[in-house]
Amino acid sequence: MSSVDYIHLDDQSIATGGTSLTGTAILEDRMDHILSLSCQDLTIEEVQRYQNKLWIIGNITNLYRLDPNIIHELLSNNFFVKIEFDYNFCPYRGEIPHQKLANQICKCPHDIILNPLISSTYDLIIKNAKHSFFMSERQRAIYSIHMPLMRFDKTSVLSSCFTKNTFDLLKTHALNYKNNQYAILEGYGGWHSQAKGVTEAKNFCVTNNIPYQILPNQSYDHHIETLSKFKGLVFMPIIDDTCPRCVIEAKLLNLDVLTNINSQHTTEGWWNKSLEQIEIYLKNRPKHFWKIVDENCHTNAS
């Protein structure tokens, strides 16, 4: 590895899934200068050792399991940016799951009774983050409601991001022969499948006489190849899904995309442009991230 300039902190330093794929794409161009750490293994020694590096902090649910002193040290004395993939300020990961799973209106992160550590953590993030990045405009708007002290001039919207290899993979399969069916992703069972609206997607297809097939979970490359052979994708999440990759992948594969307002990026201007313009926009998002980092996020070592 080359010299370490950045510390990437996330719930899992190496993982699969949309969050990990987007995180990898954002960091791809400088991966040789990034050390990845997982929240659950973070120590006070590591926080202090890399005090002069820029920390790139992603999902932090596992951070709440640590000694609060470690969190305070990290967010008070280190340089960091925060990437908000979903709704880490809530233990249920958002307003809708909070309502459905706890039967309560979400007042996070400042519901002290529910989880004071989340509240104090986000107070420090809002106060000390050099910049915060969001997946969609509507996600950022929800954060601003829950954290009214958040400064918009220190925030940006990225969207989901894709590696160069993923763009190549999507382009390879975009011209595949399409059958006459619509795909519904099966999810990972339990609450995940419920949140992703599997039942709602099935009901939508039945109501509208749309032939569909449930797509089982596969390795990423096989998933893209299989998905590419469908006429379209039906995705009806019941939660605020900040910028679901699956609908972007489907669009870049030339599929008809049927989704709802809970796919939060679909109200943004870039989503309704041509495939070529969408691809250009998406390819520039990691560059946008690093441009902001380079211009605004200096450390003592810079």
What are these regions (language model features)?
Residues 159-223:
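Conserved catalytic-core segment of nucleotide-activated headgroup transferases in glycan assembly
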Residues 114-115, 119, 127-173:
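Donor nucleotide-sugar binding/catalytic pocket of nucleotide-sugar-dependent glycosyltransferases
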Residues 1-62, 66-68, 77, 90-95, ...:
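N-terminal pre-catalytic "stem/leader" segment of glycosyltransferase-like enzymes
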Residues 85, 234-239, 260-262:
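Short Ser/Thr-rich beta->loop micro-motif in glycosyltransferases that lines
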